[in-house]
Amino acid sequence: MTLDISKYPTLALAETPDELRLLPKETLPTLCDELRTYLLNSVSQSSGHLASGLGTVELTVALHYVYNTPFDQLIWDVGHQAYPHKILTGRREQMPTIRQKGGLHPFPWREESEYDTLSVGHSSTSISAALGMAICAEKEGQNRKVVSVIGDGAITAGMAFEAMNHAGDVHSDMLVILNDNEMSISENVGALNNHLARVLSGNLYTSIREGGKKVLSGVPPIKELVRRTEEHLKGMVVPGTLFEELGFNYIGPIDGHDVVELVKTLKNMRELKGPQFLHIMTKKGKGYEPAEKDPIGYHGVPKFDPAHTSLPKSSGGKPSFSNIFGDFLCDMAAQDPKLMAITPAMREGSGMVRFSKEYPEQYFDVAIAEQHAVTLATGMAIGGYNPIVAIYSTFLQRGYDQLIHDVAIMNLPVMFAIDRAGLVGADGQTHQGAFDLSYMRCIPNMVIMAPSDENECRQMLYTGHKHQGPSAVRYPRGNGMGTPIESEFTALEIGKGRLVRQGEKVAILSFGTFLANALEAAEALNATVADMRFVKPLDEALIRQLANEHDVLITIEENAIAGGAGAGVIEFMMQEKIMKPVLNLGLPDKFIHQGTQEELHEELGLDAKGIEQAIRHYLAK
């Protein structure tokens, strides 16, 4: 449903940045108010990311007003906050389609718009990319400006600091804007720093910092304190000390909701040479009281009525796999005081809220630091504890070296609870959990499990927790199938699958939650169906039996076919000279766009009807 733009008269004049730059500066506050209201009304009708964008309205307007985009290059880290950017860059009328199949991409996307300089989705990539672009811009000599906008969560990641460290050394012209909406860096900041930011006086910063050190050092009672905690004190007086030490000229913090002051500051900073760092303070959810009070709850929202003060509650029913994991953690921790649960900033999404409250001493949120999360678990395992790393499939990619080098080589008992395995739906290419079976299956010592339903998931989590080596349980986004969940824990036999349906000629080997689809297809084909359970080690005896008793084997998984579970079946059969035709069904060799999970399964032929058709087509060859 398209909104009536006549209700937003100033916004109607700014469909593109070129039009925006024609507006008088005094109209910008009105534009921001209309843009914020438009964003709220649009997302409430379509669903999507809300609170982050509400907090970056003034910054977005100011950036496009000051910088000559798309010639000047603007990069949004992660991209949750980029909805206002999409609205102002010619995509306003398409906003109702965002995150939907065939609609606007959920994040900035190069194929979608020339204003989207970098395709994003994962955090903390913007500064590295901006530096690369800035280096090239200097070589071209066209006075192109490069700006990176990064949040206070994303900037905690190691990659961001690696990039800033290099940028300070290379000294290219670029601007990093820290969108700080949590007061995480500047709790002790007062009026002095706001004044210094407005006058943009780096020399004054330096004199105050150095002069303050001299004054404090001359006072005997605190002379020793200053000597021992000099860096801490500098950080209290000047929050940008860290960034200045990395080679940036630090300005801020300033009010990120004063669009006129932002424009003045950005115009001044646009002409500065070398790496610049602007620290702005914003409020996530700005302008919509429920989102201001609950920015986490309103980070990503379903369709809702903005007139109501709360989001619609889910209808209940079948539990999500994330909640099954959360319940497992609580139940297991009641028995095992050495259980340690680690998450890289995914407490809510991974179903760990209850556990974090009931067992706070066994819960560790390491922020956006996947590499650290994995090796932290290594240390805990060496210390005699039982760590569980709760992580999305797409984010485990970032800790791959640590998985191999720090866990698997030492054969340590670390379990990975891999959420969002398979197609996640609306977040698109950057978030699909398409590769974990492929990138884990080649690692020695790994035990990899793929449950077919919620009870099997619970028992596999228990199996992995008790296993004396590295293990992984991968499960999809969304709710289970309604299978009754046994409260009692039962360890599964490692590497053993089970026959679910006996048929003739065709045997379907199902890895994971496509089992229900496989069974439905098997009814039409009178095929045998096996729930393989383990991707590694494979149930080789069961594969041999099925190959001996059937003419054709079909494997199905919600993972890339290349290198996945089905590839493992073929490798085993070729090694054993078992010459039977095998059809691998799974995700094709391409990045899968956004859409609902159901839409994507149907499009890729992975629903029951598609599986049946694929098998019939294969048999007809």
From Swiss-Prot:
Keyword entries, A-Z: Isoprene biosynthesis, Magnesium, Metal-binding, Thiamine biosynthesis, Thiamine pyrophosphate, Transferase
GO molecular function: 1-deoxy-D-xylulose-5-phosphate synthase activity; magnesium ion binding; thiamine pyrophosphate binding
Annotated EC: 2.2.1.7
Keyword Ligase: no
Coiled coil feature spans: none
Pfam families, per the entry: DXP_synthase_N, Transket_pyr, Transketolase_C
List of residues binding thiamine diphosphate: 80, 121-123, 153-154, 181, 288, 370
Pathway entry: Metabolic intermediate biosynthesis; 1-deoxy-D-xylulose 5-phosphate biosynthesis; 1-deoxy-D-xylulose 5-phosphate from D-glyceraldehyde 3-phosphate and pyruvate: step 1/1
Domain of life: Bacteria
One Gene Ontology term, aspect cellular component: cytosol
PROSITE patterns on file: TRANSKETOLASE_1 (PS00801), TRANSKETOLASE_2 (PS00802)
Gene3D superfamilies: 3.40.50.920, 3.40.50.970
Known catalytic reactions: D-glyceraldehyde 3-phosphate + pyruvate + H(+) = 1-deoxy-D-xylulose 5-phosphate + CO2
List of residues binding Mg(2+): 152, 181
Cofactor binding remark: Binds 1 Mg(2+) ion per subunit. Binds 1 thiamine pyrophosphate per subunit.
Necessary cofactors: Mg(2+); thiamine diphosphate
Claim: Transferase is one of the keywords in the record: yes
One example of a Gene Ontology biological process annotation: isopentenyl diphosphate biosynthetic process, methylerythritol 4-phosphate pathway
NCBIfam families the record matches: dxs, PRK05444.2-2
Similarity field: Belongs to the transketolase family. DXPS subfamily.
Its job: Catalyzes the acyloin condensation reaction between C atoms 2 and 3 of pyruvate and glyceraldehyde 3-phosphate to yield 1-deoxy-D-xylulose-5-phosphate (DXP).
Matching HAMAP family: DXP_synth
Subunit structure of this chain's protein: Homodimer.
Protein name as catalogued: 1-deoxy-D-xylulose-5-phosphate synthase
Organism annotation: Vibrio vulnificus (strain YJ016)
